[in-house]
Swiss-Prot record:
Zn(2+) binds at residues 171-172, 175, 187. This is Ubiquinone biosynthesis protein COQ4 homolog, mitochondrial. Lyase that catalyzes the C1-decarboxylation of 4-hydroxy-3-methoxy-5-(all-trans-polyprenyl)benzoic acid into 2-methoxy-6-(all-trans-polyprenyl)phenol during ubiquinone biosynthesis. Pathway: Cofactor biosynthesis; ubiquinone biosynthesis. It catalyses: a 4-hydroxy-3-methoxy-5-(all-trans-polyprenyl)benzoate + H(+) = a 2-methoxy-6-(all-trans-polyprenyl)phenol + CO2. This protein may be expected to contain an N-terminal transit peptide but none has been predicted. Component of a multi-subunit COQ enzyme complex. One of its GO terms (biological process) is ubiquinone biosynthetic process. Belongs to the COQ4 family. Keywords: Lyase, Membrane, Metal-binding, Mitochondrion, Mitochondrion inner membrane, Ubiquinone biosynthesis, Zinc. It is found in: Mitochondrion inner membrane. Its EC number is 4.1.1.130.
Amino acid sequence: MMQRCLRLPKLLALRRDLHLAQVERQAVVTEAPEAEPQDAFERQYFKERIEISPFQRVFLAAGSSIAALLDPRRHDMIACLGETTGEDALWTILDSMQASEEGQRIMADKPRIHTSTIDFKYLETLPPDTFGAAYVKFLKDNQVTPDSRMAVRFLEEPKLAYLMTRYRECHDLIHTVLDMPTNMLGEVSVKWVEALNTGLPMCYGGAVFGAVRLRPKQRRAYLKHYLPWALENGKRTKPLMPVYWEKRWEQNIHDLRSELGITVLNKA
């Protein structure tokens, strides 16, 4: 009994030392400076990022959702809504990127899709049944440009900011591989596929509330053909965010669709 009593102060002192050591380690981690940006995207993003509080995030999410509903042409509000409501979905997307070799390369390279980064003259020389040629045709037919996407501003984590940027810049590529135009019927259908594929809340909002703006004839076609097609493809298609589209320009577009599990809607 005497030996146990003599050991007790030593044990208490040991526990105290271990506790102090743990506190010191936590203090070192807490006081460590923020890691330096690792690449050009992160360096630029930290310069342009707008820091907001949790309250401001909720306020922006509510305000942008109302503004987007009142005027769907407010792309700035739609972009704000995507950033203030999509963080959980973006973390899930990041997991899928890291689980894929192709996705890992995207996160390492952080490619951008602009007229300054894509050789469109080269894409125009590709055979018409390639993905690159189909993309150029889509841009011309719908009179759109890859330079029209808004910059991400409100996400704290730069990796998530890149994923949101990547989602926006790949939107027209998704249209291309799905063979959907940019009219309201096509946009709503693509939004359903994107919603089910990415889990982003703004995509669900665009799909649900965008359908309200369809004209009667469009709504009948939507309910009979487009919606069932979009739901089926959204559930069946492989994750689209980890696809390194820029490495697929020369791939036969029919083979690409088959690989991803995409079927094209017969619009006849």
